[in-house]
Amino acid sequence: MSLRRGRVAMAFRPAIVISVLAGIVLTALGPATVTGLLPYFTIQSNVAVGVFAGYAAWRTWRELPEPSSALKGAVTLYITITGVVYHLVLANPASPFAVAQPDRALPEALGNQFLHTVVPLLAIADWALFDPRGRLRVRYAIWWLAFPLAYLGFALVRGLIVAKYPYPFIDAGQLGYDGVAISTVFFAVVFWLLGLLLVGVDRGLSRLSGARRADGTPPPAPRADAPKAAAGAHRGDDGAPEAPAGQRQPSAGSVG
């Protein structure tokens, strides 16, 4: 990452951490407590984004390489899922799984928007602006489903214990396990396609970056401490460069 982009990232990533904290604290000012919020995928994905953004900011400050692109892609996908599911499924009156939106006090309403809108947009922007390009693989889209499926198992087991499910599309009490299975297949395919979209955008940005370099952007300057090839070559007694071992020219007396 260039010095200029690193400075922008150092300002951008703490803003993500602050947005996550603001969203959780403001939401907790409503009827729900912090511990009551923890079982929700929304909170878990936001916490993951906040922790990862803080870690990435620390690495940028220490001038270390960016964290794992596969892990960053996973975190970005999960917070994207949070935003997409909320706006298209839970808060959409046309959705069969729409949840009636309560009259929230202003702090809680702001917290809700931080968690479902502001943080997802900031996380996607961070991934698009600062991550190295061309490192995501198609197979990652399948691997990234591990956490949502693990979350499903957690939510179903918890539902058996407390008779309460965090989301209507995995509510076994209302849908039955057959209905939950249908929802699971549908959402798993959608999440897989979102993962593929992330990989596709990564590759598209990589090609765009390569095309810009081909149009005349100068290549990065060599390191000042990089040894020159000629300087590193051994020289013989006559001052001429000596051939590498195994490739020495035969002497005149040995020919024939």
Segments from the language model and where they lie:
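N-terminal membrane topogenic signal
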Residues: 1-16
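Alpha-helical transmembrane segments of multi-pass membrane proteins
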Residues: 16-31
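Membrane-helix exit/interface motif
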Residues: 26-30, 53-62, 82-99, 125-129
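Loop-to-helix transition at the N-terminal end of transmembrane alpha-helices
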Residues: 35-51, 70-74
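Membrane-interface loop-to-helix entry segments
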Residues: 42-45, 108-121, 181-185, 189
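Interfacial segments of alpha-helical transmembrane regions
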Residues: 63-80, 137-145
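Alpha-helical transmembrane segments in multipass membrane proteins, preferentially the mid-helix core
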Residues: 120-136
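Membrane-interface transmembrane-helix boundary segments in multi-pass integral membrane proteins
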Residues: 160-197, 251, 256
